[in-house]
């Protein structure tokens, strides 16, 4: 249906009333409309009011920006000169100049919401009848074409189907942030293309995000674009790496992120789609496509999505974001340059000392047992493993210090050629005691289900060897 020209079905002079049959206040004022000679526009059941204009397509109500019914509009010379909504005897008398109008009606009666403002409706009306105002180029899809296949054909997907980014869906996604659609967040590597909030929303739609995920996604993007995150290198490396998003704070619970059972796996919409949206933006805006500027030799599943929330349920545990300088109780994201998951199983350690030594044995294998101060890593402690530490009174600082001590080894065992293995540290480190990670290079996170003595290790990118140039990034989420 095409939107009628403003006022095309309406009188140049007189009154227009916008009603819903299901609204009791509309039924209350209906007898007055004949007295006023008003043109009646009905959003739901035109037959409920004699001579009413059928506006079930909501074109007239949208054009008049009706937010509540009944709305009474006074027109003169083809233009609106006044309006009121709901029923207020004083307001209706003031608008009409009829000082005895509605004398037998209650003084006040609240109206009802306009159908134009029902969930998901307004965005569709803007897309259909209005001007969305997007700067991105519109792509027309034929009536007989499959829009999902059209996205595949244009190379917009990560290999899985995406949600077609219609105008209504994009508008709805933009409702998830107060930031202007045209705001440029930064230049997305590797092509360094300008990334606007609008383009973020488009890719968030395709990834399957809900609007309330936008603050997390925008913060993750801002963290990834910090120079010290070296996103260009992470995208273009021959290594396995991709951005890993770790979310802390109230927003993770509010949007339903998973920090418990299967936290690093499938099945949670927020976890899956926030990480996927970032990777789609890298691909669709930045040009980071496999075989082009993405040169990963083997790749990794994190190139689809790798996003989870930290389990903050145990008050004995200091959340990662707080440990990295964010005020307690605030929401934040940490971006890490990570590979896949290396499983850690220890069913038998019962003391924090034993468990620390056991964890260190697995952490030594990150990247290569003889490469040190070369990778960062994330250690995801399951609640049962964390409880072994916490029940003994160990806090984050003590856990990290013990791991650091257990990860320090003689350089003679690590230099190239030692133990018949060519890989290793430079010969000049042979007389030193060498740490596996930089002091700030091991991020310890608590996540996972309540049952199971299983934790996980996520190896970092090889760029971590450049300590000052490539680091994880934590920023607060603007809510």
Feature locations, PLM:
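Non-transmembrane, aqueous-exposed alpha-helical and coiled segments at domain scale
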Residues: 126-479
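Short active-site neighborhood of thiol/selenol oxidoreductases, capturing the structured segment around
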Residues: 9-33, 39
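N-terminal leader/targeting and pre-domain segments
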Residues: 1-13, 99, 103-112
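Long, low-complexity intrinsically disordered regions
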Residues: 104-129
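Thiol-based oxidoreductase modules, predominantly thioredoxin-like and allied folds used
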Residues: 37-58
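Catalytic cores of nucleotide-enabled group-transfer and carboxylate-activating enzymes in metabolic
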Residues: 4, 13, 36-37, 72, ...
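Structural motif
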Residues: 18-22, 42-46, 382-384
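Non-catalytic, surface beta->alpha helical segment in thiol-disulfide oxidoreductase systems
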Residues: 67-68, 73-111
């Amino acid at each position: 249906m095409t939107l009628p020209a403003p006022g095309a079905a309406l009188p140049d002079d007189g009154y227009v009333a916008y009603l819903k049959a299901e609204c009791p206040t509309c039924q209350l004022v209906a007898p007055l409309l004949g007295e006023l000679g008003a043109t009646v526009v009905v959003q739901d059941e035109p037959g409920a009011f004699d001579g009413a204009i059928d506006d079930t397509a909501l074109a007239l109500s949208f054009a008049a920006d009706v937010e509540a019914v009944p709305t009474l509009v006074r027109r003169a010379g083809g233009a609106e000169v006044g309006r009121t909504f709901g029923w207020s005897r004083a307001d209706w008398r003031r608008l009409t100049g009829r000082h005895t109008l509605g004398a037998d009606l209650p003084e006040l009666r609240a109206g009802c919401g306009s159908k134009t403002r029902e969930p998901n409706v307004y965005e569709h009306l803007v897309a259909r009848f209005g001007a969305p105002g997007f700067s991105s180029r519109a792509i027309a899809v034929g009536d007989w074409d499959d829009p999902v296949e059209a996205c595949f054909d244009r190379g917009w997907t990560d290999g899985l189907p995406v949600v077609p980014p219609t105008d209504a869906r994009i508008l709805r996604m933009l409702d998830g942030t107060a930031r202007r659609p045209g705001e440029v967040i930064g230049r997305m590597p590797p092509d360094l293309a300008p990334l606007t909030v609008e383009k973020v929303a488009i890719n968030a739609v395709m990834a399957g995000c809900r609007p309330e995920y936008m603050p997390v996604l925008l913060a993750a993007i801002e963290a990834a674009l910090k120079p010290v995150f070296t996103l260009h290198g992470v995208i273009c490396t021959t290594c396995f790496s991709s951005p890993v998003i770790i979310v802390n704070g109230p927003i993770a619970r509010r949007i339903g992120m998973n920090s418990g059972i299967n936290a690093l796996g499938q099945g949670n919409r927020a976890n899956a789609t926030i990480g996927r949206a970032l990777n789609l933006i890298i691909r669709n805006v930045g040009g980071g496509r496999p075989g082009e500027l993405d040169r990963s030799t083997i790749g990794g599943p994190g190139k689809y999505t790798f996003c989870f929330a930290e389990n903050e349920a145990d008050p004995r545990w200091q959340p990662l974001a707080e440990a990295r300088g964010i005020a307690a109780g605030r929401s934040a994201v940490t971006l890490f340059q990570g590979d896949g998951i290396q499983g850690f199983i220890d069913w038998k350690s019962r003391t924090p000392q034993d468990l620390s030594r056991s964890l260190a044995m697995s952490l030594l294998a990150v990247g290569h047992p003889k490469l040190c101060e070369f990778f960062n890593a994330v250690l995801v402690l399951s609640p049962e493993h964390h409880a072994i530490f916490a029940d003994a009174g160990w806090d984050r600082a003590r856990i990290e210090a013990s791991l650091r001590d257990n990860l320090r080894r003689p350089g003679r065992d690590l230099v190239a050629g030692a133990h018949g293995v060519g890989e290793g540290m430079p010969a000049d480190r042979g007389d030193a005691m060498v740490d596996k990670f930089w002091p700030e290079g091991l991020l310890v996170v608590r996540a996972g289900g309540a049952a199971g003595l299983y934790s996980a290790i996520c190896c970092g990118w090889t760029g971590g060897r450049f300590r000052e140039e490539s680091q994880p990034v934590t920023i607060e989420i603007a809510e």
